[in-house]
């Protein structure tokens, strides 16, 4: 493991052939197989900031293919093992029920997991887990249903299960399904797709501010703001402006240059361009960001509140620092010209991070060759694939996806599977915290943790208090709500709300608190009383529009808005950018309410599936200096009520290659014929047509079905040349 060195010096050494330990031990050689490294050897290939080190917590065979991790109240680590994910280049048997959720325990507190049990066996690619007070919530690939698993005899193996929330089947690409299961400050359980309210063991679903808000992973900060990411949308941190449940805003959130990754592994195994080949194939834009967390640990006071996001293609982890002005946040790379953690090991594939109960930063590393789902990993050249070229930004050379397959096969990467490591990052000279025993503690003991310096302890204690439903904790919570610790005052109020014990007096006192964070939380908590037009709350809010803290004032506006009275804030604080952005959002929503019913249903499909590349406004999402996908708002195929024959073909089979002479960053519009019904595809077309082209008609499922039948035998995506022959 190496401490940070100046990137300019590193780049110069690379070009001069002076870096001796690239990719693995030895010089870069594109004609050899890359060796599999031991955890200790792999750690030596990592760079982290000076004064910090990486430790191995678990590795194969104790853990295999770790795609997601979560701690329970006693510090045990639950791991989703994707034992069928891309076990070969053909994704053979990928949906076979042989994956697992395993439970790892550090029995002696030395920082190494030493006991493993298979908590759940023989399942399909578990995507998310949330260990609670007496159960573990789990979601699996191919379904949105959430299950509750119970370990009645506490032997580390689940004994029974029940449905916590029954969802629909989800046969979309496995990289675009449900993810999350995060207990938030407002006592909702958040996923990337929706929020859930805990109700005595069952879950009640609620929407986010729009459809799917994140791809794989979800994080929260001290004040309940979510940090989202898009893999295909090349965005490690977005939509972090407002607490969960409020509008997701289409505003600029990042500093110039934020989207440039700074990896050090010169392995050209990504297909869609974005490589600086002159710099040994260094990735120039994000492509697979996922697994984010927010650092909320006293071990890292200098980074507290920053977020981490994994980039497995770039073999790096980005740390994002947030600055706030007039209540609006901006994301910055915390290490300009570098990254928080990066590796030269070809098989280092970080996919998930957690801020742990001991205060350390935990990283789940799939440690494998292929991190591309089969849909975007063709292995043979067909006539349709001949046009699937993407342009390298620096050399203007063409490379095909199939050529990428042959490269990685030559390097031996296709056969590196069934490994996996879990690391933790710790500071030199500082002791990690003790392991918790919350599952064995009384409610009174849990209340004391609400003022803990580690955010993980506060969140877990609040979750356990609310999910237990023990109203005997209410007196202690009231005392903490009036105490000296800011975090304690906030969490105690939210715990009281979750237990149905919050009183108006505690809300009104919080609205006058010396801490802006307590005032903001109390304004949010006041919304039920405001909706009932409680005179005391109306009077208190009326005097808070001029709060010196811009985030508090913004929350006051949101409270009036939630009660259907945004006019009560009219003419106040015009300098607040988020207030203006929410008003703009509401104006746009008012127009969408006039859409047809099929278009409104299609909007959900669009926001869950298409928005990460085509953008909320239909103008395309920009990554580095290129759009990921063409602007639908300018599509000639959608003009004049649309060419359904062409549009349905694109949705069903996908489209590849340049469009109008432009090579878009995503490279391929994926086929949707297997994942979406004729009705869903008709509705998403209707939404896009009405939204950006003024269509006066709805596309029918029958129209899509006819095209589906006509092209049933076709293999591979369409090219622009193909579609020209079909369209006018």
Show where each model-derived region lies.
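Short inter-helical turns and helix N-cap capping residues of alpha-solenoid HEAT/ARM repeat scaffolds
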Residues: 453-454, 484-485, 514-516, 548-549, ...
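Beta-propeller domains with acidic blade repeats across secreted/periplasmic ectodomains
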Residues: 24-445, 456, 464-466
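Gly/Gly-Pro-rich "capping" loops immediately C-terminal to redox-active cysteine motifs
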Residues: 483, 619-678
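Post-cleavage N-terminal segment of exported redox proteins
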Residues: 427-437, 498, 528, 561-600, ...
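Electrostatic cytochrome c docking/interface patches
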Residues: 584-607, 617-624, 628, 636
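Flexible coil segments in periplasmic/lumen-exposed cytochrome c-class electron-transfer proteins
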Residues: 26-33, 375-376, 583-597, 664-728
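Structural detector for internal amphipathic alpha-helices that build alpha-solenoid repeat scaffolds
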Residues: 433-436, 456-469, 487-501, 506-512, ...
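The canonical Cys-X-X-Cys-His
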Residues: 364, 422-425, 602-617, 669, ...
């Amino acid at each position: 493991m190496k401490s940070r060195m100046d990137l300019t010096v590193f780049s110069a050494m690379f070009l001069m052939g002076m870096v001796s330990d690239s990719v693995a031990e030895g010089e870069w050689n594109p004609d050899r197989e890359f060796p599999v490294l031991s955890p200790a050897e792999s750690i030596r290939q990592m760079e982290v900031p000076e004064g910090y080190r990486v430790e191995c917590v678990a590795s194969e065979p104790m853990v295999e293919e770790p795609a997601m991790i979560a701690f329970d109240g006693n510090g045990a680590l639950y791991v989703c093992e994707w034992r069928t994910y891309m076990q070969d280049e053909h994704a053979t048997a990928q949906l076979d029920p042989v994956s697992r959720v395993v439970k790892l325990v550090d029995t002696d507190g030395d920082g190494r997991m030493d006991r493993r049990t298979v908590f759940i066996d023989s399942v399909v690619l578990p995507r998310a887990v949330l260990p609670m007070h007496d159960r573990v919530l789990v979601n699996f690939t191919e379904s949105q249903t959430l299950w509750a698993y119970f370990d009645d005899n506490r032997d580390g193996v689940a004994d029974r299960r029940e449905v916590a929330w029954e969802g629909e089947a989800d046969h979309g690409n496995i990289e675009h399904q449900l993810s999350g299961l995060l207990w938030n400050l407002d006592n909702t359980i958040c996923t990337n797709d929706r929020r859930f309210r805990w109700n005595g063991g069952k879950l009640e679903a609620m929407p986010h501010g729009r459809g799917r808000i994140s791809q794989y992973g979800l994080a929260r900060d001290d004040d309940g703001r979510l940090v989202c990411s898009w893999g295909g949308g090349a965005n490690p941190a977005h939509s972090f402006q407002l607490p969960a449940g409020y509008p997701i805003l289409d505003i600029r959130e990042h500093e110039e240059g934020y989207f440039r990754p700074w990896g050090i592994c010169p392995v050209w195994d990504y297909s869609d361009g974005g490589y600086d080949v002159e710099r040994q194939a260094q990735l120039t834009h994000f492509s697979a960001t996922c697994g984010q967390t927010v650092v909320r640990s006293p071990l890292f006071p200098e980074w507290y509140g920053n977020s981490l996001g994994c980039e497995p293609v770039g073999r790096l982890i980005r740390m994002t620092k947030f600055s706030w002005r007039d209540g609006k946040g901006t994301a910055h790379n915390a290490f300009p010209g570098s990254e928080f953690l990066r590796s030269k090991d070809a098989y280092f594939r970080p996919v998930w991070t957690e801020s742990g109960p001991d205060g350390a930063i935990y990283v789940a590393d799939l440690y494998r060759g292929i991190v591309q789902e089969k849909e975007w990993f063709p292995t043979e050249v067909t006539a349709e694939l001949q046009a699937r070229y993407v342009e390298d930004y620096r050399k203007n050379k063409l490379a095909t996806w199939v050529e990428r397959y042959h490269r990685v096969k030559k390097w031996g990467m296709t056969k590196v599977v069934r490994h996996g490591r879990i690391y933790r990052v710790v500071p030199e000279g500082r002791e990690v915290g003790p392991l918790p025993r919350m599952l064995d503690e009384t409610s009174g003991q849990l209340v004391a943790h609400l003022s803990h310096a580690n955010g993980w302890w506060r969140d877990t204690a609040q979750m356990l208090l609310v999910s237990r439903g023990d109203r005997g904790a209410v007196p202690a919570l009231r005392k903490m709500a009036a105490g000296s610790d800011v975090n304690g005052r906030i969490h105690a109020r939210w715990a009281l709300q979750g237990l149905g014990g919050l009183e108006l007096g505690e809300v009104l006192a919080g609205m006058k608190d010396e801490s802006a964070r307590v005032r903001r939380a109390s304004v949010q908590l006041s919304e039920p009383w405001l909706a009932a037009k409680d005179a005391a709350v109306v009077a208190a809010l009326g005097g808070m529009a001029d709060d010196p803290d811009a985030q508090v004032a913004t929350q006051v506006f949101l409270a009036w808005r939630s009660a259907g009275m945004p006019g009560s804030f009219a003419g106040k604080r015009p300098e607040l950018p988020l207030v203006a952005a929410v008003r703009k959002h509401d104006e746009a929503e008012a127009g969408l309410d006039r859409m047809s019913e099929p278009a409104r249903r299609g909007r959900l499909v669009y926001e869950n599936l298409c928005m990460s590349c085509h953008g909320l406004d239909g103008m395309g999402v920009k990554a580095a200096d290129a759009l990921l996908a063409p602007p639908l708002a300018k599509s000639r195929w959608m003009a004049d009520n649309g060419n359904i024959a062409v549009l349905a073909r694109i949705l069903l089979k996908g489209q590849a290659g340049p469009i109008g002479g432009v090579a878009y960053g995503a490279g391929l519009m994926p086929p949707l014929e297997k994942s979406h019904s004729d009705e869903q595809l008709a509705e998403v077309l209707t939404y896009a047509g009405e939204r950006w082209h003024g269509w006066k008609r709805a596309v029918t499922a029958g129209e899509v079905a006819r095209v589906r039948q006509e092209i049933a035998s076709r293999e591979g995506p369409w090219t622009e040349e193909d579609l020209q022959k079909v369209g006018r």
